[in-house]
Amino acid sequence: MPRSLKKGPFIDHHLLKKVEVAAEKNDRRPIKTWSRRSMILPEMVGLTIAVHNGRQHVPVLVSEEMVGHKLGEFAATRTYRGHVADKKAKR
């Protein structure tokens, strides 16, 4: 269920500060964050945010279509290696 409109979007304060500083200085370096739960705001468009997936930080270039989604949606946490083939079927 989506968040109530009267509450507004959730974003961690430390991430919001980093985004404001990067936008003010016109800094292009990636912003490293562990906050997968934060929502993407219009102020983040054009910035690169390195989102932690549990093992490493995945760089995500924020575009206008991403506004309103959460950062964690763009950094996959699981790797799919395919189904294991049956050894008897190969013979």
From Swiss-Prot:
Keywords: Ribonucleoprotein, Ribosomal protein, RNA-binding, rRNA-binding. Transmembrane segments: none annotated. One of its GO terms (cellular component) is cytoplasm. GO terms for biological process: ribosomal small subunit assembly; translation. The keyword rRNA-binding applies. SUPFAM superfamilies: Ribosomal protein S19. GO terms for molecular function: rRNA binding; structural constituent of ribosome. It comes from the Bacteria. PROSITE patterns: RIBOSOMAL_S19 (PS00323). InterPro entries: Ribosomal_uS19, Ribosomal_uS19_bac-type, Ribosomal_uS19_CS, Ribosomal_uS19_SF. Belongs to the universal ribosomal protein uS19 family. Protein S19 forms a complex with S13 that binds strongly to the 16S ribosomal RNA. This is Small ribosomal subunit protein uS19. The gene is rpsS.
